[in-house]
Structures are given as structure tokens and as C-alpha cells.
């Protein structure tokens, strides 16, 4: 039985509801109905983010364009590795490269990937825009040192490479044989006198600053020591080690990666279409620092997978020797040194692709290092080519795209264009039209994650069919409840009585004048008492009674004929980040707590893209695309298996249909790799609590409810 307090409270609520005007209640219900989607709130300008603005993201096209920050000491060497992972399958370990064993005496004759060569015409880079002319000679010299690509495959088999190819092209090739080293030493000894000055100019300053140092600077001595240290490390490690790692299955909660195929499963072979997965990722964590690399092979096939694995293999192996080497000369002290090493590792990945004969691949590299004089503060430096993107998630600042400058957010780009790629894009030259360096400051607990376009594109509101791109050829939805163009002519809108009165006019009847009634005699009896309004009435809110001012009325968003809101390029990019924020902060069904581990983040992203593309997969897994009904000689109908060409034709017919185009999502290879900053320090505490080593299960799409995205 309800208590007295409950009865009084219910009575007050009833009084408040009765006293509220009907117009106010109707407006309140309409406001609640329009408040369901954050996309609508963002487009109407009513969205209130609970995140504060994060640190600035710096970007540039050259290592000298980036600000210089001093780094704190960090752990290096093979013994300091706390986590390492690669994939899918064997990942970068599927590439077997024979390393060149060199001694210190041949350090100056190493064909470093960033050394300026005499024949600059052989090392041009294909770019969509002409290179910027640098005014000063020093800047030109520094740029040429940073951006020199290799002219061709660094190693070829003896059957494919002619003996005189190296001398004919004017390039020193790196071969894994003692005779090659002897020939290289003899050739260099014969030309030492003529190349003394050019060799001095060709030395790269790894400890680069904004101004190029003059001859005689101690940096030249540091450069010589660095070259010797990097070359000696190549022959000191066992052949089984790749990037200094012996066991690549050391993933954990703070360092994790997943790669899956979103394509449909072939009903006959029981394998996903598009195999093998042409993505590759690799990550090495040393204490509070990490090196990450993500590659996405262009198109399908073994060539694309080989290119992705080679790119990750080459860049991580170089970073292991140049940034995380055993020697002190191989450890970076400023962020500019890190960017120089990132660019060199990118070219090393390109050279590895040419060595193994791979196709094209995108590449995104990120290095997380601690900042000097700021405990708990870190910096992430990245270099990317193509459409594999990098992000930073923080419970304080939300989601920020680290590689935002690599693509134009103000335009509606074609999702099928990778924008750039390593490998033989133009002869033996890569496509570096969107080569971008990025940097931002992060804190302990933030999560840095790299994704392929199979992840990032499926968070796009246009790809997810939550909105439509506002292009010049799109048709807008007309506003208003009544369409004047569909109304009948005025004469046809007349009623039958109105038409009859118009055709048969008559004099309307006149109404007699009213007479005033006599006044009633005064009544001296006491009148009935009038009840006053209850003083316990709870007055309704002012905003529900009175109409809102014109400035508060949300702006009407333009919509297409299909009813979807139209978004511009910047709005499209912002909504992509907001969807990532919403997923990582509240989960798929909006009831989870913010994501705190790299493992959980990877599973959330993979589960989301699986869900949003499930309709397309189910459509392409229909039995009619693999079998057809055929009538036999006895007149009985039976199923006949389609051959490969017939299946391709049937699949293409379904994919090109308007019904399939209207389905949300994009079928692709989806890969994500994440690292929790400073996670290695808290790893032991997590294991003591009993949840540090728990493996999150791969959740299926059917276990989730629909989200209010």
C-alpha cells in the first residue's frame, strides 16, 4: 500500500500535468521525438560534447616542417621488449630476407636508403603536385637527403639480374655475398680520390635540426658512428630475429591487433571471398615506447598481401636498428630525428617490396616515445602513405585523427582511391602524393590505434547510409506539408454546393432583428462560494508553456529525396569521429563503460563493422548465387552448381543492383591495431587483480541490439 508521501507526490504530479497547456505538452513530445540521433543534433547545431579540445596535431610534408621536441630516455634493445604482435596469420614473419653481414670497415660503402646519389634522375618520385622549390641551398640539400628513393629492386635473383646492371644504372646494389662486398670495396677504393668531396656531402645528418650544420660539426662524427652501429647490428642478430623480436605472439591487453575479412563466405568452399587477406600489421613495445606499422595491400591477391607484409617487415626492421638499437648513437633525442628515421623506414619498406616482387601497398607508421621533463606525457610521431589512418582516443579529449592532413576533408573523395601507395606504382617508383608527417602529444592511458580503410570507411555516415553526400547533382527534398504543384485547378476544388450556388444565385434569407430581454430582478440570496486555485500546484516549466524564441528553433537540415540528411565534407569527417567516440565511450548498445584497453578497442571496432556489413554479406550468400534449378531428362527439377564464371556474373548482377547499393556498409578487409600508452607499466598490476590476462571473446553480431547511431 502506498505511503502518505507517495500519495502526496503523485497528487502534485497530477496537478502539474493537468495545469500544463496542451500546446506545451505537444511541443515537449515533438522535441523528445527529434532528440534521438546525434547526427540530427549535430547538423542542427544542438550537439553538446562532453570532451574538451585536445592538444594540437601538427603535420607537414617534410621532417623539417615539424616542431622539435626533446625526448626522454627510453628503453631499447632486444631484452627490453615487453609485447609484440603481427598478423594476420604469420604476418610480417612470412617474408624471409637474407641480411647483409658487414664489418665496420665497409660502413661508408653501405647503400643507405637516404643517401643522395649522383644520378638524381633515376630516383625521381611520382607526385600529383610539383615539388616546392626551396630557396636556400642548404634546405635543398637537406630535402634531397630525406627524400631520396631507391632506383629499383635492392636484391634480385642471379637469374634475373644481369652482371652489369649495377654499373649501367649508376647504383650500388646490396647483395648478400662476400664477393659482392669485395667488389664493392675494390670499386670504392678505385674512386676514393674522385669522390672524397661528394661522399662528405652525401653523409646524412640523423641528428638533424632546422638549420643544416656546416662541415666540421660534431654531428658528422655522430653520423659516422650511427652508420657503423646500424650496419654492425644487421650482422650481429641471429637470422631468426625480425626487428629484434623472436616471439611475435606476445599480444596482451595494452598491445593488440585483429585482421578479418568482411566479405561473404563462399557456400561451396566455405572460405571468405577475397582471400588471402591483403592487410598486415606489426607492433613492438619496449617499456613505455612502441613502434607500430599498418599496411593495406591494394586490391586482392597474393601480390597485394606480399606487398603489405614486405612494407611492414622493412620499416619495423629499420626502426629496430635506427631508433631502438643497442648502441647509444641509435637512440633518438628529438622528434625530428624520429621523423627522419620514419621517412627512411618508409623507403626501406618500399625497397623490400621491390626485392620480393610485391604489388602496391599503403603504409602507416607510428612511434610512441616519452617526452623529456614531463612525467606521464608522451608524443606520437607518424608517417603515412595511402588511406590507412591513425587515431588517438582519450577519455578526456575523445577521438582525434592523427593522419587528418593526408586526405582532404573538404571534398567528397572516392573511397576506391587509395591516394598513395608504395611499390612499383610508376615503374619502380612509389606514389607519394599524400605522404604526410603527423605529431601530437598524448598522455598515459590514451589509446593510439591504426586502422585500414575497411574500418575507417565503415564509420563514415555516408557509407553507413545514415546520411547522403551533398554533391551538385543531388536532388533536395521540397519543404512544406502541401505541394502546390499537385493541387487541382481552382474550379475543380469547389464543392458541389458552392458550384450550385454560383450557377443559381438567389437572395439569402434575412434574419429578424433580436430584441433585448428584460432584466431579471435582483437576487439578494448569498451566492455559491467560488473555489480558489490550489496553492500547492507545481507550475510547469517556462520553456514548455511559452513558445521558444526564434533563435532557439533548430535549423532545418537539408534532406535528399530519399529522406536522408545531406552532409558536406567537413561534416562527414566530424560525424565519423563522433561515431567512433560514441562507440568507444558507450559501446555498441550504449550501456558499456569507456574503453580502457587496446584489446577491447579492437574487438569493439571489429564487431561494429561486422554488424553494419551483415546485410550485404547475407545478400551475397544467397543460395541462388551458387546453384540454379535445372530440369533433367525425366522432367524433375534439381539444383545444379554454377561454375566460377557463372557465379561471378550472378554476383556482379546483385552488386550492381539498386537494392544492394542501398544497403549500409562496405565489404573489405578490416584490420585494426591498438596500443595503450604507458600500458606496460600497469600490466603487472592488472595481472594481480585477475583481469590483466583475460582474453575478451570475439562477440558475434547477433548478441548486440540495434544502436541509435
Curated annotation (Swiss-Prot):
Coiled coil (UniProt feature): none
Name of this protein: PP2C-like domain-containing protein CG9801
InterPro entries the UniProt entry points to: PP2C-like_domain, PPM-type-like_dom_sf, PPM-type_phosphatase-like_dom
PANTHER family: PP2C-LIKE DOMAIN-CONTAINING PROTEIN CG9801, TIPA
Domain PPM-type phosphatase: 259-503
Organism: Drosophila melanogaster (Fruit fly)
Signal peptide (from-to): none
Pfam families, alphabetized: PP2C_2
Bias (Polar residues): 130-143, 197-217
Biased composition (Low complexity): 182-196
Ranges where the record places region Disordered: 121-222, 503-530, 678-709
Amino acid at each position: 500500500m502506498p505511503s502518505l508521501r507517495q500519495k502526496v507526490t503523485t497528487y502534485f504530479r497530477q496537478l502539474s500535468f493537468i495545469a500544463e497547456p496542451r500546446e506545451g505538452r505537444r511541443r515537449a513530445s515533438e522535441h523528445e521525438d527529434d532528440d534521438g540521433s546525434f547526427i540530427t543534433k549535430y547538423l542542427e547545431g544542438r550537439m553538446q560534447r562532453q570532451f574538451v579540445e585536445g592538444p594540437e596535431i601538427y603535420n607537414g610534408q617534410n621532417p623539417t616542417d615539424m616542431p622539435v621536441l626533446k625526448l626522454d630516455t627510453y628503453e631499447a634493445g632486444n631484452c627490453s621488449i615487453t609485447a609484440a604482435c603481427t598478423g594476420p596469420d604469420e604476418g610480417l614473419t612470412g617474408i624471409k630476407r637474407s641480411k647483409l653481414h658487414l664489418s665496420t670497415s665497409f660502413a661508408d660503402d653501405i647503400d643507405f636508403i637516404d643517401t643522395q646519389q649522383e644520378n638524381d634522375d633515376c630516383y625521381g618520385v611520382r607526385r600529383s603536385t610539383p615539388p616546392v622549390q626551396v630557396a636556400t641551398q642548404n634546405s635543398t640539400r637537406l630535402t634531397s637527403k630525406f627524400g631520396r628513393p631507391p632506383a629499383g629492386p635492392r636484391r634480385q635473383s642471379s637469374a634475373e639480374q644481369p652482371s652489369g646492371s649495377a654499373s649501367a644504372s649508376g647504383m650500388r646494389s646490396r647483395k648478400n655475398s662476400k664477393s659482392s662486398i669485395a667488389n664493392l670495396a675494390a670499386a670504392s677504393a678505385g674512386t676514393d680520390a674522385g669522390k672524397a668531396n661528394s661522399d662528405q656531402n652525401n653523409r646524412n645528418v640523423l641528428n638533424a635540426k632546422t638549420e643544416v650544420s656546416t662541415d666540421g660539426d660534431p654531428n658528422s662524427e655522430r653520423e659516422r658512428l650511427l652508420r657503423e652501429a646500424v650496419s654492425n647490428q644487421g650482422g650481429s642478430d641471429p637470422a631468426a630475429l625480425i626487428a629484434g623480436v623472436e616471439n611475435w605472439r606476445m599480444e596482451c591487453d595494452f598491445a593488440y591487433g585483429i585482421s578479418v575479412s568482411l566479405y561473404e563466405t563462399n557456400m561451396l568452399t566455405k572460405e571468405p571471398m577475397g582471400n588471402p587477406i591483403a592487410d598486415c600489421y606489426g607492433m613492438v613495445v619496449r617499456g613505455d615506447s612502441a613502434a607500430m606499422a599498418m599496411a593495406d595491400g591494394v586490391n586482392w591477391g597474393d601480390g597485394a598481401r606480399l606487398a603489405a607484409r614486405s612494407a611492414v617487415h622493412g620499416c619495423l626492421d629499420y626502426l629496430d636498428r635506427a631508433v631502438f638499437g643497442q648502441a647509444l648513437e641509435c637512440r633518438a633525442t628529438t622528434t625530428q630525428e624520429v621523423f627522419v628515421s620514419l621517412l627512411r623506414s618508409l623507403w626501406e619498406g618500399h625497397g623490400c617490396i621491390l626485392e620480393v616482387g610485391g604489388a602496391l601497398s599503403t603504409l602507416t607508421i607510428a612511434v610512441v616515445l616519452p617526452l623529456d621533463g614531463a612525467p606521464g606525457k608522451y608524443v606520437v610521431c607518424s608517417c603515412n602513405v595511402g588511406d590507412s589512418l591513425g587515431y588517438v582516443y582519450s577519455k578526456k579529449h575523445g577521438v582525434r585523427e592523427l593522419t587528418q592532413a593526408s586526405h582532404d576533408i573538404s571534398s567528397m573523395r572516392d573511397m576506391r582511391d587509395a591516394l598513395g601507395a608504395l611499390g612499383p606504382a610508376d615503374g619502380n617508383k612509389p606514389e607519394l602524393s599524400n605522404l604526410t608527417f603527423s605529431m601530437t602529444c598524448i598522455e598515459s592511458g590514451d589509446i593510439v590505434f591504426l586502422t585500414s580503410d575497411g574500418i575507417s570507411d565503415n564509420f563514415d555516415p555516408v557509407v553507413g547510409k545514415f546520411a547522403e553526400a551533398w554533391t551538385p547533382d543531388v536532388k533536395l527534398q521540397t519543404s512544406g506539408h502541401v505541394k502546390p504543384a499537385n493541387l487541382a485547378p481552382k474550379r475543380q476544388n469547389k464543392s458541389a454546393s458552392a458550384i450550385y450556388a454560383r450557377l443559381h444565385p438567389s437572395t439569402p434569407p434575412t434574419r429578424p432583428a433580436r430584441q433585448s430581454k428584460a432584466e431579471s430582478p435582483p437576487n439578494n440570496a448569498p451566492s455559491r462560494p467560488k473555489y480558489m486555485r490550489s496553492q500547492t500546484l507545481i507550475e510547469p516549466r517556462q520553456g514548455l508553456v511559452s513558445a521558444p524564441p526564434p533563435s532557439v528553433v533548430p535549423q532545418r537540415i537539408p534532406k535528399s529525396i530519399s529522406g536522408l540528411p545531406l552532409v558536406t565534407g567537413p561534416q562527414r569527417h566530424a560525424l565519423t569521429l563522433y561515431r567512433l567516440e560514441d562507440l568507444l565511450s558507450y559501446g555498441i548498445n550504449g550501456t558499456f563503460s569507456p574503453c580502457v584497453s587496446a584489446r577491447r578497442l579492437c574487438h569493439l571496432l571489429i564487431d561494429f563493422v561486422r554488424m553494419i556489413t551483415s546485410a550485404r554479406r547475407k545478400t551475397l550468400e544467397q543460395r541462388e548465387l551458387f546453384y540454379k534449378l535445372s530440369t533433367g531428362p525425366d522432367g524433375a527439377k534439381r539444383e545444379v552448381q554454377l561454375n566460377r564464371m557463372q557465379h561471378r556474373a550472378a554476383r556482379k548482377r546483385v552488386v550492381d543492383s539498386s537494392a544492394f547499393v542501398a544497403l549500409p556498409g562496405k565489404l573489405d578487409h578490416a584490420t585494426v591495431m591498438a596500443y595503450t600508452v604507458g600500458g606496460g607499466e600497469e600490466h603487472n598490476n592488472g595481472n594481480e587483480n585477475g583481469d590483466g590476462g583475460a582474453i575478451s571473446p570475439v562477440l558475434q553480431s547477433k548478441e548486440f541490439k540495434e544502436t541509435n547511431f
